[in-house]
UniProtKB/Swiss-Prot annotation:
Keywords: DNA damage, DNA repair, Hydrolase
UniProt-listed Enzyme Commission number(s): 3.2.2.-
Protein source organism: Lactobacillus delbrueckii subsp. bulgaricus (strain ATCC 11842 / DSM 20081 / BCRC 10696 / JCM 1002 / NBRC 13953 / NCIMB 11778 / NCTC 12712 / WDCM 00102 / Lb 14)
GO molecular function: alkylbase DNA N-glycosylase activity; DNA binding
GO biological process: base-excision repair
Family indicated by similarity: Belongs to the DNA glycosylase MPG family.
UniProt-listed InterPro entries: Formyl_transferase-like_C_sf, MPG, MPG_sf
Protein name: Putative 3-methyladenine DNA glycosylase
Amino acid sequence: MDYRNFFTGRPTSEICRDLIGRPFYYQAGGEKIGGYIVESEAYLGIYDRAAHSYGGRRSHANEGLWRAGGTIYIYSQRQYVFFDIACQEEGNPQGVLIRAIEPVWGLDQMLKNRGGKDGVLLTNGPAKLMQAMGIKSRNWDLAPLADSPFVIDLTEKKPAKEIVASPRIGIVQADPAWAQAPLRYYVAGNPYVSGMKKRDWADDHGWL
């Protein structure tokens, strides 16, 4: 996969939207665990008050954002881990967060990894999908995506009927302009989108 070109050379918001419908999975020991990306968020670097790199912040914890596009950036909050990918050229610390997937591969293993939680609770949030894949640490932080057991299949894209742009989730401490910036993308009507109300679920999960 040509991740370097995919994650550079165009606005991060465009990259983020283009991830919707792509297969994303973790492959280890011959088993494939994952599904289609249904929700993602863009973070635009040093000027984005919601970004970990806002104001030029750089540390061991967020170094992944500063690396070349296509580098994995995994960060932790309490006992949870979250999966991001650096965008743009090295030194321009922008990135995308994979927020949710519709599970397709390795469902039995996902169910075990999530302690029996099933249905939409399996992967309808960024920490949940990492748990479902069995990822509990930052071991793959800073690794090039191409050299890791994670795969985003750029040769396939499940078409969505509608991709919605909305404010990012949980951004309350930032400047209102950034808190309300429409930098979250999701498949309209897909039940695996975090916070999607049951009344808004589509029978076809929002796919064409």
